[in-house]
Amino acid sequence: IEVWECEEGILTTGLQAAAQALPFLPWRGGVGTSLPEVNPDLKVFQDPICGETLIAVPPLKPDVTLLHAATSDAYGNVQHLGGPGWLDLFLYRAADRTIVQVERVIPNEEVRANPWATTIGGADAIVRAPYGAHPFYSRGFYVQDNDHLRLYTEAATAAAQDGRPEQLHAYLTQYCR
């Protein structure tokens, strides 16, 4: 695994650049930080129109993107209830391949009856995974499980900060099989 140092804004900007097939996109965040020093792919430049200092963020093109959505047919026509987040669309458009786990696989006739609900057309693979987003929410199916997130946070904190991995190991053994 290669580490590519950045912050969230740079990550999304790089994905957007790849989704739009651009050589880079400008980003204001990170100007004046050490990010361009620790990540040589980030180039500081002067905006030729306004003269402002910006960072050129190159396209980030994942080999594979893994997403979660409400439903899809067997042909990869994905439907997010309430629409996808913009990051899902950037990831889908930037990646070479997209795998989407869904709460339900629906008949193609249902997709064709509601074509405006299709947010991603032609995902490379669909995996039926009821409760696949748990402990987070899946719109239209279940809400975020804050009690479960608290269990995980306590276990991870004990392992990371207190040097006690037993609680995290027990959590992973019980919930992540």
What do the predicted segments below correspond to?
Residues 1-177:
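Conserved alpha/beta enzyme-core scaffold
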